[in-house]
Amino acid sequence: MQLCRFYFPDEEPALSLPKEPRLGQVVGGSVVDLTASGQPAFATLSALLQASVTTPIEALLREVNLAALPAYAWRDLEREPAPGTPHLLPPVDRQEVWAAGVTYAWSREARVREARSKDVYVRVYDAERPELFFKSTAEKVVGPHDWIGLRGDSHWNVPEPELALVLNPAMHIVGTTIANDVSSRDIEGENPLYLPQAKIYRHACALGPVITLAEGLDPQHLAIRLTVRRAAAGQPEAVAFQGETSTAKMHRSLDELAGYLGRYNDFPDGAVLLTGTGIVPGDDFTLQDGDQVLIEIEGIGTLCNPVRQM
């Protein structure tokens, strides 16, 4: 089962469609408007995550008569929104977004290459306690087809494709989505204390397109693919970078990461936790203005974002 957040933009007033964010369930080629059911649990994502502490989301969905609710035509997730179709929002409303680092061996090696303080990354990879850091407020997260940004004070910016866990207030994994943990590698490499500046800024976190519920999906064995498309002046678009990994290569379990995030902390609206990247482009690669970044995760879908120089 897959859920999404969506809205209908203001440029289509003649359609008399609701303008506030909605929760939807993806069913075949349609998005069914769960918010239209009037049930409090489907009013917002926060309400749903809170309700899931006592009742599984799958059980809440079984109580809804989907046939009686408005349904809107879905679309190819790699295409721009078409008039009259739901425009996808990032799957967060009031959740804090956190991230884990150095959870794959390849990520550890890349951090060692870029860093002046190399032993920091070696030690955290093997340590009992994982690296966890704050990534974004919900307001700064971008969704499918929205742009991701390149810092003007950095010359080495990369996408980091990651599986993201959707957690309820009890820190239970209720679903997964796709994340792009955009990073300025030169800033982080200069000094580990610069990590917040390398990771936390406007348009540096993309999530979506949907939340795949945990039931029936093994998130510890999912293929992840990254493609960066680039069009040179006067030339057709071509692949500038492509890579693939699997969550099976992750050094830590997902429950372990979620458990550490919840230690001595409270998340009344739930949280989203990025689980680290196992795909790191070579040291000679950096994102450029106009690139298109596509991240595909098995069982979830494809997150597509254009790149813009800030």
Pin down the residues of each PLM region.
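Gly/serine-rich nucleotide phosphate-binding loop at the start of the catalytic core
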Residues: 1-54
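Active-site microenvironments in enzyme catalytic cores
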Residues: 1-13, 54-230
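Active-site-proximal helix-loop elements at catalytic-domain edges
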Residues: 40-72, 235, 240
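Catalytic-pocket segment enriched in acidic/His residues
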Residues: 7, 185-310
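Short, solvent-exposed aromatic-acidic interface loops
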Residues: 36-41, 178-183, 246
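Short, solvent-exposed cationic patches
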Residues: 16, 53-60, 262-267
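Residues that act as N-cap/strand-start positions at coil-to-secondary-structure junctions
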Residues: 18-20, 159, 220, 289
